[in-house]
Amino acid sequence: MRPLSGLIALALLLLLLLTAPSSAADTETESSGSPLTPGAEEPRRVVKRAPTSSFIGMRGKKDEEHDTSEGNWLGSGPDPLDYADEEADSSYAENGRRLKKAPLAFVGLRGKKFIPINNRLSDVLQSLEEERLRDSLLQDFFDRVAGRDGSAVGKRAPTGFTGMRGKRPALLAGDDDAEADEATELQQKRAPVNSFVGMRGKKDVSHQHYKRAALSDSYDLRGKQQRFADFNSKFVAVRGKKSDLEGNGVGIGDDHEQALVHPWLYLWGEKRAPNGFLGMRGKRPALFE
């Protein structure tokens, strides 16, 4: 029994020795993948995660936390864009320093355009712009001088409105016959004196008597048909008052009905027209004797 028990103990010891490395490896893997923050002395190890500096593309962040190099993305070895011999303020040196790193800003479709800052280039562009402006002003001045002649005034537009209610333009100096013809033509084009001369113009009342309808046989009080000079061409409406007539007419007497039937009695004798309200548009003025 002793040899058998010794063999069993030896087998168990060998089994323990074989399983110990595998358990240690599993423990190390679990500890490395732990989400806990590592200690100050323990190095940081991240498994299957993106770099800690996040985006390292076009905007060129460093993928290592403590990297102090210039970040030459052209690779190791001699730099083909070595501008060490150039001056520090030259555009070549600036361009070389820029090519050694990713751009600091987005330079895509809507991005900024890199232009080397050069005072000489700015001076050249400004001088070219001033020269172009000077040539343009000189050419404009020469064109004005060469194109001026005696008929330049006649080509200008009239100084004022020359329509129906407008002013007659001043006649230019020239032939007397031509001036007379032009004045006659302009006079014929003007509106009549006693007619409507515009949208806001007034109409003369001196010629309104013949435009009224003749006196008919109705003899009513509606006041739309009047004699030529009756009521001074004023509107006589239904709402107008009718004053009493005194009996010194021509054989008519004081009959009020006769005054209504014969409205022309106002013109006979020494009778004046009534001063009362005779319509919707105001009073009727007294007729001159």
Curated annotation (Swiss-Prot):
The modification Valine amide is found at V153. One of its GO terms (biological process) is response to pheromone. Transmembrane segments: none annotated. Residues 24-94 are annotated as: Disordered. One of its GO terms (molecular function) is signaling receptor binding. Residues 1-24 form the signal peptide. Its main location: secreted. Residues 25-47, 285-289 form a propeptide. Tachykinins are active peptides which excite neurons, evoke behavioral responses, are potent vasodilators and secretagogues, and contract (directly or indirectly) many smooth muscles. Stimulates gut muscle contractions. Required for the response to the male sex pheromone CH503 which is transferred from males to females during mating and inhibits courtship behavior by other males. This is Tachykinins.
